[in-house]
């Protein structure tokens, strides 16, 4: 029984299945996800159907694209949120969800996604968020789900896009992005999720491969699974991390270990 974490999927079914085959994902294993199941990629419905079929063996945190999908399914989406979603690649998911037969079941599934997953040896969250924002929560972070996140007060713009909650600035303090002036200590001061427990995130697609900053103790495994060379001048990959061994493999066949790719 192994535990795997997959980066943002974004409707990239074929690459997802390739990566899972390469890591030898089996019927006894559990698959975690950094969020963002749909949008941008070509096979949103296939991804939803497959992941739902895993039942309790699949666990995903809330990504910003999942928020839009849930709003649409629960008929709470505003015009501004809908426009923002469409601008960010949501049209393919809209068409899937508009015609979906099991809308109630899919809505319940999305609604169950938590903001954060805390395990004994790692935590999973879509991206890093400032401590001052998370400390406002009226609900313990571990109890926030898609259904109650609007009541938690950690999301300022439920009907649009909250760039404070879905933040990239803290991650950009890593030497991966800022070789001359890295600020891992400042990042830890800004986000209390950076501590002795490994934090695994997605949200920020990486064209240079998996990020593992040992000093910040954060790992980003979003390697742009939806990207195509024709559109983005980069052939995206879905990366799957074995959290027990720290080995990972991507859909191109590249494999390594976090210790081998750590930012020094």
Locate each region found by the language model.
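Active-site environment of divalent metal-dependent phosphoester hydrolases
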Residues: 10-14, 39-42, 66-70, 131-132, ...
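Divalent metal-coordination and catalytic microenvironments
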Residues: 8, 36, 51, 63-64, ...
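N-terminal active-site segment of His-dependent metallophosphoesterases
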Residues: 1-50
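Active-site-proximal beta-strand elements of phosphoester/diester hydrolases
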Residues: 2-10, 122-128, 219-221
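Catalytic phosphate/metal-binding cores of nucleic-acid and nucleotide-processing enzymes, i.e., regions
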Residues: 6, 77-79, 99-103, 131-140, ...
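Active-site neighborhood of divalent metal-dependent phosphoester bond hydrolases
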Residues: 45-48, 53-123, 130-131, 138-154, ...
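Residue-level marker for buried hydrophobic side chains located in beta-strands
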Residues: 5, 31-33, 60-61, 123, ...
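Conserved beta-sheet core of the metallophosphoesterase superfamily
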Residues: 184-250
């Amino acid at each position: 029984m192994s535990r795997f974490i997959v980066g943002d999927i974004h409707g990239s079914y074929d690459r997802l299945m390739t990566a899972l085959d390469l890591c030898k994902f089996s019927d006894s294993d559990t698959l975690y996800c950094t969020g963002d199941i749909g949008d941008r990629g070509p096979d949103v419905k296939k991804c939803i159907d497959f992941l739902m079929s895993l039942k309790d063996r699949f666990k995903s945190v809330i990504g910003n694209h999942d928020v839009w999908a849930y709003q649409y399914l629960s008929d709470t989406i505003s015009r501004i949120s809908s426009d923002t979603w469409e601008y960010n690649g949501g049209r393919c998911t809209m068409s899937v969800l508009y015609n979906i037969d099991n809308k109630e079941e899919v809505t319940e599934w999305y609604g169950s996604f938590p903001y954060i997953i805390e395990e004994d040896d790692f935590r999973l969250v879509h991206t890093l968020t400032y401590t001052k924002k998370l400390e406002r929560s009226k609900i313990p972070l571990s109890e926030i789900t898609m259904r109650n996140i609007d009541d938690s007060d950690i999301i300022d713009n439920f009907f649009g896009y909250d760039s404070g909650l879905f933040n990239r600035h803290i991650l950009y303090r890593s030497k991966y992005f800022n070789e001359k002036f890295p600020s891992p200590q400042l990042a830890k001061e800004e986000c209390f999720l950076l501590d002795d427990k490994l934090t695994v995130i997605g949200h920020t697609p990486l064209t240079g491969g998996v990020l593992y900053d040992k000093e910040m103790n954060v790992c980003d495994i979003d390697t742009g699974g939806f990207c195509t060379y024709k559109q983005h001048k980069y052939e995206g990959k879905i990366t799957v991390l074995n959290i027990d061994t720290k080995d990972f493999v991507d859909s191109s066949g590249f494999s390594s270990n976090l210790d081998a790719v750590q930012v020094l």
